[in-house]
Structures are given as C-alpha cells and as structure tokens.
A protein has these predicted regions:
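General marker for long, soluble alpha-helical cores
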Residues: 1-190
C-alpha cells in the first residue's frame, strides 16, 4: 500500500492492466487522483467490480471522460450511488450505450437534471422502461428535445404521470413522435 501511495506521476502511466488487476481494493483506494488521471485505458478496463467499489467519489470524478468510457459495464454497475451523483458532465456525456444499460435504476435515479441532459441521444435510446421510470421527475425537465425523441416507445411506457407532467410543463411533450404519443396510456396522462 505504501508503494501505491508513493507512485510518481511518471510511474503510474506505466502500470499494466495485469498490475492494476492484481491490486487489492485497499491499494486501489489509495491511488492518488493525479495517478488515476494518467492510467492507460487498458488499466482502467482492468478494474474489477470490487476495485471499482473501492474508488472514492473524488477518485471517480478525477477520471477523464476518455478513461470513464473504458470502465467496464460491471465496474460501472458497481459504483455506489454517491459516485454517480458526483460524475462530471463530461463523464456523463462519455457514457456508452453498453454502460448506460448496465446502470442500476438506483444509479439512474441519482442522476441530476444537469447530468441527465448530458447523456447522448444514443445513451437515452438505450434506456429501458425501468430505467426511464427511475429518473427523478424533476430531472426530466432537463431533457433536451433530441433526448425526448430518442426514448424508445417501449421505454416511454415506464414514464410516470409526474414525469409526463414535467414534459408538458417544459413543452418537451411537443418533441414526442406520433408513435411515442400513441404509446402513452391514460394513467400516464393524469
């Protein structure tokens, strides 16, 4: 552990995926943010579920958006909700469709409106009905027109009446396609 803490910013980028995979969770938790920022994409991909869980909010927030894109889906799903809350807008914008599908409903529910509006339309299109339902209704107001259009018809069925009300209040309801409108039921429109 002392060796990990003592790593210099010139040594950290040289850590291989195998070396990262061999680190204990305690060692991972001791990696400094300056060292995390310079880890290779292969090293980031090598982080296990338990190692990802060991990362602090500060460590997760320190990852560049390019590094974040290389976190495995299991590692993403393992991040505690408070880590999700502290994601930077650039990290959220970098979330891939595979990563967004791996997010738990609890993690999705912890995205702020500002974070939600940074999801790409591809990421929004990959959200399931249960993930859509988990979005905080106040955060729905931050969705862009393109994001609203990107919601799959089958996922739109997951929206609550409170979420639909936010779309109406922000005039985003106009962004819905005919197929999306036809998929809404009377309970959602109350």
């Amino acid at each position: 552990t002392d060796q990990i803490v003592a790593l210099s910013s010139t040594q950290a980028p040289k850590l291989s995926a195998q070396q990262i995979a061999a680190l204990s969770t305690t060692q991972v938790s001791k990696l400094g943010v300056d060292n995390l920022k310079v880890l290779s994409y292969d090293a980031i991909e090598a982080l296990s579920v338990s190692q990802a869980k060991a990362l602090s909010s500060t460590q997760v927030s320190a990852l560049t958006s390019a590094q974040f894109k290389h976190l495995g889906t299991s590692a993403i799903a393992a991040l505690a909700s408070d880590r999700i809350v502290n994601l930077t807008n650039d990290q959220v914008a970098a979330i891939t469709t595979d990563q967004v599908q791996a997010l738990t409903t609890s993690q999705i529910g912890n995205l702020s409106g500002a974070q939600l509006e940074k999801l790409t339309t591809s990421a929004v299109a990959a959200l399931s009905a249960s993930q859509i339902k988990a979005i905080d209704s106040a955060a729905v107001a931050n969705m862009t027109t393109d994001q609203v259009k990107a919601i799959k018809v089958e996922a739109l069925g997951g929206m609550s009446s409170a979420q639909i009300s936010q779309l109406v209040a922000t005039t985003q309801i106009k962004a819905l396609t005919t197929a999306q409108v036809n998929a809404l039921d009377s309970a959602q429109l109350k």
